[in-house]
A protein has these predicted regions:
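Hydrophobic alpha-helical context, especially transmembrane and signal-peptide helices
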Residues: 4-6, 29, 33, 144-146
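Rossmann-like AdoMet
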Residues: 1-11
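SAM cofactor-binding core of SAM-dependent methyltransferases
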Residues: 10-90
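Intrinsically disordered, low-complexity N-terminal regions enriched in serine/proline/glycine
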Residues: 7, 15-19, 92, 117, ...
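Short loop/turn elements that flank and shape the SAM/SAH-binding pocket of Class I
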Residues: 88-92, 106-107
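Conserved acidic-Pro-Pro-aromatic motif
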Residues: 96-162
Length: 162
């Protein structure tokens, strides 16, 4: 690949690569299974595999982005350790080690008791969710560590305290 990864994914319309070291850089994903809600075109799944993840399962509700992952991204990268699934229903918590959710609005469907099974969880909260969503999320995020705020301050990512 002749261009850097940030430019590659930006040209695909998946302009988040620049965030990954800030959000996920301190995660030890080596030989771990990462479950990800909000996979976009698979750029973060590629990031995790490049950092040594054993396997990544990601959910993405936009079929065009899943197709872009399969057609474009996998033509450049080895995607054999990545499974792309469709829309997350808020009830599916596959076995794994690390759980991340960065899916606009999906965070309000999160079952905080279900994610306790993972070693580490990252939850991204978006400022455009309705008040009722915030009211549900905030009590569950007490004692979680704020690890990232987006450039536009419209998204905050929290890491589980366990």
């Amino acid at each position: 690949m002749t261009q850097d990864l940030n430019s590659y994914f930006k040209e695909l319309g998946c302009d988040y690569w620049y965030e990954y070291d800030k959000v996920y850089g301190d995660l030890d994903v080596k030989d771990k299974v990462v479950i990800q809600v909000g996979g976009d075109c698979g750029s973060s799944a590629i990031y995790f595999v490049m950092k040594g993840a054993k396997r990544v399962i990601f959910y993405e509700s936009d079929p065009n982005l899943v197709e872009k992952f399969r057609k474009d991204v996998c033509s450049w990268f080895d995607c054999s350790r990545i499974e792309a699934r469709g829309k997350w229903d808020g009830k599916d918590y596959p076995d794994g080690d690390i759980f991340t959710i960065d899916c606009e609005g999906c965070e309000v469907s999160l079952d905080f008791s279900a994610i306790r099974k993972y070693q580490i969880c990252l939850v991204s909260v978006h400022n455009w969710i309705p008040y009722e969503g915030w009211a549900k999320l905030i009590p569950n995020l007490v004692n979680w560590k704020l690890v990232y705020g987006s450039r536009d301050s419209k998204e905050l990512t929290f890491r589980s305290p366990w």
